[in-house]
Design a protein with these regions (language model features):
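Charge-dense, helix-prone N-terminal extensions
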Residues: 1-112
């Protein structure tokens, strides 16, 4: 099972990646975010940076829905992400190989 350190290791190994200083992790390529910590928002409370959940760029709404419907134990979304090609990934439930695939795919789509 993965954690924030695994995300950092994978993202830092990719070409042309910039790490943004944050309370969690935040990685970009060509000024476009591809993986970052989930900023959980609860009405009436301060935002909480969740390093146990990664926000991943997935390219389009079709891919987002496929991931959400196909693997609900791994992926979820929140109302603030409606209309955005982003999913949240529960790091504790994903294995290292799948995490590497997801981070690399997100990077590739944003770098291209």
């Amino acid at each position: 099972m993965a954690d924030a350190d695994d995300v950092r290791r994978l993202a830092r190994a990719l070409p042309d990646v910039t790490e943004i200083d944050s309370a969690g992790f935040d990685f970009r390529v060509r000024n476009k975010g591809f993986v970052w910590s989930y900023p959980e928002r609860t009405p009436g409370r301060p935002r909480v940076i969740r390093t146990d959940v990664a926000v991943l760029y997935v390219g389009d709404e079709a891919e987002k829905q496929a991931l959400l419907l196909g693997e609900p134990e791994l992926f979820f979304t929140a109302p603030g992400y409606d209309g955005w090609p982003l999913v949240m990934l529960r790091l504790a439930r994903v294995d290292a190989d799948r995490l590497a695939e997801l981070v690399t795919d997100a990077w590739r789509m944003r770098a291209g």
